[in-house]
Amino acid sequence: MSRIRIYELAKEAGMSGKAFADKLIKKGYQIKGHSSTVDDATADEIRRTFLGTKESGQDTGQATNEAAAAHRPTTVIGGKKVDEPVVPEKIVEEVQAVSVEVPKEVVAEEVKKSEPVKAEKSEPVIQEVAPVVEELVTNKEAPTAPLEREEESQLKAQKPTIEKEESAAVAKPEVVSAGSNEKKAGAPEIKRAEHTETVEKSKTAVDSKKVATPASTDKKVKPAQQPYRSGGVRVIGRVELPIQREEPSRPRRKPTRPPVNRSPRPSTPSPNRSAGGPPKPAAPATPAQDDSRNRKKKGRRDEKPAERDSRPKAKGKKGVKFTHFGTDYQNRGRRPRRGKRDAQTLPPSEMKASKKHVKVYDTITVGDLAGRMKVKASDVIGKLMGLGLMATINQSVDIDTATLIATEYGYEVDQGITDELGIQLLTEAEEGGIEVGRCPVVTVMGHVDHGKTSILDAIRKTDVADGEAGGITQHIGAYHVKAASGDVTFVDTPGHAAFTEMRSRGAQVTDIVILVVAADDGVMDQTREAIRHSQAANVPIIVAVNKIDKDNADVERVKRELAELDLSPEEWGGTTMYCETSAKQQIGIDELMESVQLAAEMLELKANPDRKVIGRVLEAQLDKGRGPVATILVQAGTLAKGDHFVVGQHSGKVRAMLDYRGRSLAEAGPSIPVEVQGLSGVPSAGDEFVVVTDEKMAKAVSHDRAMKAREAELGASTKISLDKLFEQMSEGEVRELRVVLRADVQGTLEAFAKAAADLSTKAIKVRLLHEGTGTITDSDILLASASDAIIIGFNVRPSAKVKALADKEHVDVRSYDVIYHALDDIRDAMVGMLDPTFEEEIIGDAEVRDIFSVPKIGVIGGCYVTSGKIQRNAGVRVLREGVVLYTGKIGSLRRFKDDAKEVASGYECGIGVENFNNIKIGDVLEAFIMNEVAATLGE
């Protein structure tokens, strides 16, 4: 059995809970306060008693108004209570006593009609009630007596008899309240449809708990003059509304201001009122205004997403259309909503498997790796420190290290295909194809001044050696010769010790090596080095014994020396071909060319001319008028004008091709050396030359290579060992010879830079501040002036303007044509920077035979010079019985009474020692001098 609390009954009565409880206690009910509960029977009795008392007199009107103002009645909407406006007391007094007389047939008929009615079908019943309420509100100020007489006469005309006290059929109009309906036994909880949630507030609305609902409009009502009799409430009918899904509760709204007693205007009850239920408070507006306001105040959370998106946005200035800011800017004045119904918020679960992959190319920076894994860079750095790697956020790590770090965070590393890898794939795709025969590439190697270039001159019938400074080759040269025996490409390499790298590159790009050995000189150092390079490259060697026309030529000695180096001649049972030549006398040149063709036939040299070009840089330089220029040896494919290529860290487009004679070429096939213009920079000699599909790919690859080179420099090991620490501490004592180096071509520059760096010793170091190809510029002068360096130019000369600037800045600029002259001057400059050394030389001995004491001077020893001579201001040692007592300087030297500059052997003299007076007879004075000796470069 359900129980009802007192404050719920107080709400039905429109009084405060405390006042209502006090009144019940005075009447003898056993309750303690407004929170006490009573059963349904007691609640019905309290309703009858209290309502009858309240209607009978006017003494409770003021208390009722106060209670209504303090506790406004609420209406249950969708499972929650919403405050309703309070009707002024005067209106309540006139309306609450209305009684309705309805025949039983009409009541039964209404019940039958109302049973199947749903929430949406209740509008016709509401429209029938509207005139009655409107009439009541309109005529509230009319006198009561005339109204009663008029209504009685109308009722009598319609029905002959009206009972004053109805106790059976219709005892009193049905009083329906939210609280009583909820607590009725067996009565289901009535919930309105969602579209009735918003309650219209009006200061002149009629209290829904005090107005009776007539069954039809043809029955007139009359105000009651007497209080109700205690008769029980009879339920005429109940409308079963569909139970709606319970929505999240919204905060209760409170009225913005208290109600004011003023004349109410005609109002229309809410169209959502159900039959037999309490009426909704009427809004003080016309039906048209009411409809528009209902549409405007429709619950937003009841709208569908499509309706909510189509709802008009906040109004701005007239004619202004927001096109760039979106709804966040336009709706900034609105109150934020509690949540978006249609927003699909993903739970904080793990990422999808497809998102747990990180693409890494060859390297990746720590910051990029952390960003792709969505973790802090400091955490990744901590992981790297745990692996023993000290890395910064901008430092790169390789793919293996990135894989270890990513695995700890649950990621998989996928290796991306870089442009560099794309070039490799492109090169592999070009492999195969139809190959045709090509001419051999022959490199001429040997010791300096053994006649390499002279042999080439004899073959080409040119005179290159005379044009070389000092008669030696200082550039790597490539020539294509068309001979009677066949076409041959020759690569001429320097023979000087400084050009080891050039000889190594020449051996790598060649098919056959011609080793030139002078018959009068034999095997030398660079000869042995050339043999090592050739054997390392697995290239066959043809020996040309040159200068056989000289008187002291010894061919057999050369063969013996070479046989010791695994180059046995064929006539001795070996596999090496020998040719005896004389370049100046044109002896043996044809036999040498035939040997070259024979070796080429044995190698079966072939290449595919239709594939993408692959070549090698033999030489590169920065030309003043043409920019970067490189000598390329095409190894495969056919190079044409307009081809895009990558060479080392640079890229470009073939804009012009020249042969070794300076003639323009349209294309160049395999084994053809050409000079290419159109590079973005000067490449290093030995770099690979690759033709790519387009300019975009070429630039991307060159940029990636440049970045990798820079990262390699920055990523050098920064760990300092104890030995390195001592080396750095001692570097302050090591002197430096700073050099700014300029050369005409890249290969010579590299060779000269390496040779200069090899001159460094423990005492003095050669430091190259800057090196580059091309002429000496103003920036070189300023750099040398700021760093106290010298400038060395190899095959380049400064202009008059640069010379004037060098004189102004006091910078030493030197130019050379022969490389070993430059190296000798650098060595002399290093020696000049060293501190000189001194050697001691004993010049004479003197024996003390007497002692004289001279005032203000001290003790003077009378000595006899036994050997050599004694010089003034020379050093002296005082020896007593072979033990050195003192080492100092001779203070005075006299012969008799005159000062002497020196005293020779066999003469007597007086010698005074500075700051030493303990001279005794028998001591030996040993005179010596310190001679300066020039310093030498150690190891």
Swiss-Prot record:
Give me the ranges of the annotated region G2.
471-475
* InterPro entries named in the record: EF-G-like_DII, EFTu-like_2, IF2_II, IF2_N, P-loop_NTPase, Small_GTP-bd, T_Tr_GTP-bd_dom, TF_IF2_bacterial-like
Compositional bias, Low complexity, is annotated for 259-277
Where GTP binds, per the record, is at: 446-453, 492-496, 546-549
Statement: the UniProt record of this protein carries the keyword Nucleotide-binding: yes
Where is the region Disordered? 51-81, 137-353
| Residue ranges of domain tr-type G in the record | 437-606
Annotated region (G5) at 582-584
Q: Where in the cell is it found?
A: Cytoplasm
Identify one Gene Ontology CC term for this UniProt entry.
cytosol
* Segments of this protein annotated with the region G3: 492-495
- Disulphide-bridged cysteine pairs: none
- Bias-annotated ranges (Basic and acidic residues): 181-210, 300-312
Region: G4; residue ranges are: 546-549
Q: Record's PROSITE patterns?
A: G_TR_2, IF2
Q: Which Pfam families match?
A: EF-G_D2 (PF22042), GTP_EFTU (PF00009), GTP_EFTU_D2 (PF03144), IF-2 (PF11987), IF2_N (PF04760)
Q: Where is this region: G1?
A: 446-453
Q: State the Gene Ontology terms under molecular function.
A: GTP binding; GTPase activity; translation initiation factor activity
Any idea which UniProt keywords this protein has?
Cytoplasm, GTP-binding, Initiation factor, Nucleotide-binding, Protein biosynthesis
Family per similarity comment: Belongs to the TRAFAC class translation factor GTPase superfamily. Classic translation factor GTPase family. IF-2 subfamily.
> What is its biological role?
One of the essential components for the initiation of protein synthesis. Protects formylmethionyl-tRNA from spontaneous hydrolysis and promotes its binding to the 30S ribosomal subunits. Also involved in the hydrolysis of GTP during the formation of the 70S ribosomal complex.
Q: What is this protein called?
A: Translation initiation factor IF-2
Specify the species: Desulfotalea psychrophila (strain LSv54 / DSM 12343)
Q: Which gene encodes it?
A: infB
